[in-house]
UniProtKB/Swiss-Prot annotation:
Segments passing through the bilayer: 28-48, 59-79, 112-132, 140-160, 165-185
Keyword Cell membrane among UniProt keywords: yes
Pfam families, alphabetized: VTT_dom (PF09335)
Organism per entry: Bacillus subtilis (strain 168)
Record-given protein name: Uncharacterized membrane protein YhjE
Chief site of localization: membrane
One term under GO cellular component: plasma membrane
Location in or out of the cell: Cell membrane
UniProt KW keywords: Cell membrane, Membrane, Transmembrane, Transmembrane helix
Membrane topology reported for the UniProt record: Multi-pass membrane protein
Length: 207
């Protein structure tokens, strides 16, 4: 089964696959990352790799970035508009969410930019928490656009030549190492922000 799958991953088959995808036009390349912002279980990395291999590195990157950024902004605006209703009350009352809201409100751009730079950060949660917080719309848009710019470009650059990634073991190892480092650093940043928010909440409670 695995051998059959690998035998399909030739340059010719991959080119044909990506040409078929490209036939749908740039609209689908923007829509898929946009939809992922609402349905975070969808594979954003797969969409970005498909876009860069179908439309080229730069065009695929721009289309992916535009869709993902637009999706984050839409989620933020929807949550900002309807977040005070009872439907989202259980989210606002969750201790972890409240800690993140406190951190975002106090520090704004910086933490969100850092979190959104890393591919394995739950960006959907960041969008929702930002929408529930009192952070301004402009700082969020700036953080989302710049953070996604870094993150989407990293994915685009690593996954641009999918055939070479499969057939050249050294490049594959390097890509895996880079992804592992990004995951590790992202988790460290996420944990640091969580601890800092907990400390500030504790200090505030003692005053």
């Amino acid at each position: 089964m695995l051998e059959h799958f690998l035998s399909y991953l030739t340059q010719e088959h991959l080119t044909e696959l990506f040409q078929s995808y490209r036939a749908f036009g740039p609209l689908i390349a923007v829509l898929l990352p946009l939809i992922e912002a609402f349905l975070p279980f969808l594979p954003l990395i797969v969409f970005v790799v498909a876009n860069t291999n179908s439309f080229g590195l730069w065009e695929g990157f721009i289309l992916s970035w535009a869709g993902s950024t637009a999706g984050s902004i839409l989620v933020f605006l929807i949550v900002r508009q309807y977040g005070q209703r009872k439907l989202l009350g259980f989210i606002r009352s969750h201790p972890s969410v409240r800690k993140l809201m406190l951190w975002v409100e106090r520090h704004g751009f910086g933490p969100m930019f850092l979190l959104l730079c890393f591919p394995f950060t739950p960006s959907a949660a960041v969008n929702v928490v930002a929408g529930l917080s009192r952070i301004g719309t402009r700082p969020f848009i700036l953080a989302a656009a710049s953070g996604k710019l870094v993150m989407i470009f990293m994915i685009s650059f690593i996954g641009y030549d999918l055939h070479a990634l499969i057939t050249q073991p050294i490049r594959t190892v390097i890509a895996v190492l880079v992804i592992t480092v990004l995951w590790y650093v992202g988790k460290k940043v996420e944990r640091y922000l969580h601890v800092r928010a907990s400390q500030r909440e504790h200090d505030g409670g003692r005053q």
